From Swiss-Prot:
<feature type="transit peptide" description="Chloroplast">
    <location>
        <begin position="1"/>
        <end position="52"/>
    </location>
</feature>
<comment type="function">
    <text>Involved in light signaling, probably by mediating the transport and correct distribution of protoporphyrin IX, a chlorophyll precursor, in response to far-red light.</text>
</comment>
<dbReference type="InterPro" id="IPR010231">
    <property type="entry name" value="SUF_FeS_clus_asmbl_SufB"/>
</dbReference>
<dbReference type="InterPro" id="IPR037284">
    <property type="entry name" value="SUF_FeS_clus_asmbl_SufBD_sf"/>
</dbReference>
<keyword id="KW-0809">Transit peptide</keyword>
<feature type="compositionally biased region" description="Low complexity">
    <location>
        <begin position="10"/>
        <end position="24"/>
    </location>
</feature>
<dbReference type="GO" id="GO:0009570">
    <property type="term" value="C:chloroplast stroma"/>
</dbReference>
<feature type="region of interest" description="Disordered">
    <location>
        <begin position="1"/>
        <end position="47"/>
    </location>
</feature>
<dbReference type="GO" id="GO:0042626">
    <property type="term" value="F:ATPase-coupled transmembrane transporter activity"/>
</dbReference>
<keyword id="KW-0934">Plastid</keyword>
<dbReference type="GO" id="GO:0016226">
    <property type="term" value="P:iron-sulfur cluster assembly"/>
</dbReference>
<dbReference type="InterPro" id="IPR055346">
    <property type="entry name" value="Fe-S_cluster_assembly_SufBD"/>
</dbReference>
<keyword id="KW-0150">Chloroplast</keyword>
<dbReference type="InterPro" id="IPR045595">
    <property type="entry name" value="SufBD_N"/>
</dbReference>
<dbReference type="GO" id="GO:0009507">
    <property type="term" value="C:chloroplast"/>
</dbReference>
<dbReference type="GO" id="GO:0006879">
    <property type="term" value="P:intracellular iron ion homeostasis"/>
</dbReference>
<comment type="similarity">
    <text>Belongs to the iron-sulfur cluster assembly SufBD family.</text>
</comment>
Amino acid sequence: MASLLANGISSFSPQPTSDSSKSPKGFHPKPESLKFPSPKSLNPTRPIFKLRADVGIDSRPIGASESSSSGTSTVSSTDKLQQYFQNLDYDKKYGFVEDIDSFTIPKGLSEETIRLISKLKEEPDWMLEFRFKAYAKFLKLEEPKWSDNRYPSINFQDMCYYSAPKKKPTLNSLDEVDPQLLEYFDKLGVPLTEQKRLANVAVDAVIDSVSIATTHRKTLEKSGVIFCSISEAIREYPDLIKKYLGRVVPSDDNYYAALNSAVFSDGSFCYIPKNTRCPMPISTYFRINAMETGQFERTLIVAEEGSFVEYLEGCTAPSYDTNQLHAAVVELYCGKGAEIKYSTVQNWYAGDEQGKGGIYNFVTKRGLCAGDRSKISWTQVETGSAITWKYPSVVLEGDDSVGEFYSVALTNNYQQADTGTKMIHKGKNTKSRIISKGISAGHSRNCYRGLVQVQSKAEGAKNTSTCDSMLIGDKAAANTYPYIQVKNPSAKVEHEASTSKIGEDQLFYFQQRGIDHERALAAMISGFCRDVFNKLPDEFGAEVNQLMSIKLEGSVG
């Protein structure tokens, strides 16, 4: 343990080092103190649900006129990348602010704040008690300082914890949703109306602190699938919520999980009954609109024995000059023989090229493979946020259960990302696979932090981990912190890592064959990320390939 502490992870929360029949909560290794610049980030464009597979990439060099030749440019590749990213107009596509008539509670965090949120959500007494207990735990915990991220202290009294449109919709009918809100999501590329909405994906649209619409509910109900906002689920399905809320991520799991448990206002709930295959992918689109308001959503997905569900998640926020906090919790429960595939394209506003503004994205995501032969897969593309801090994890409790993690994390300018995963092997013959790709450009810092833990009763556990980093330019940094704990001699654990750099000689090689900087970078980055892109669902695949080939050409962030 001493050598692990010296090598640099301290409090890599939420999982335990000791064997336990309960869901693990944490081991806390201490990292060396690293001096990073204050959080800053990039200006990206990232469509989420609006797929455009037909869009190509301009074959001209970045910043060149139509008459320019790809072989005559004297601008360096790094300059071209920065020039290219400055031309990406996140502000126009997602950075706008809609003037929505909203009700916002006063700033500040206290028991009265929590009581007011619970009252506004029309919650039962047991839910208010859950919140109060979480808040009491939050007050006793200290904000973790062990990550590679560096940012000013957060003033939790100087933000709003609830903001919602005054015209409250009846979620059973899209006809009663405020037309302004429907038009708002249309502009974001998330159509909700009957005529325009995505035909084969059920969407729960969340703005600030409330869900404003959920599509395809009747179709899902025919299969017995429950898909609604978690606020509605607390009122309509209290027995299910009592059984599963906090079962995978306890309210005292970590600092931000405790905060979320106290003040979460909405999110999505999905329940797939026994031996049911969800007839379509389900998805949630999160949008922050109000200034100085944090978003604290809660997602709970339960897949009973023999069921299957695919979940998609996307998000954007306006281009504010100030930072905003997004502290979410995601819990996945997987029964015997069930499977959950969870895919995310994280597209929060990352700030401007000087690092002003952007979202602090501090998220706890964990899945529990509770039953034998169950499977949970996390696939994520992280391109936004001024700071990203998250470790989607899987606890492999059932025998022969499987956990997978596929990730691309992109940072540019002064963005910071400390992300990775944890695979906790508890059952017999469990398997896990980790593929992580990190791309860093500008002055950004990109850290992969991963834990593979094989507990003493996990006979025949197997893990393979691949962690690759790519650097663009000479000022970015990439760190990899693999953490391996094996307590059973029958385990087979493999880990490999690499760091590469896109250099002028490689780009010159492409140019000699008539391929300009833009296409050369797109080709190299696309190939670098292929193992992860291939795991994305079709609903994301076309968009992410375009996103990477365009934005990643400088490393996106």
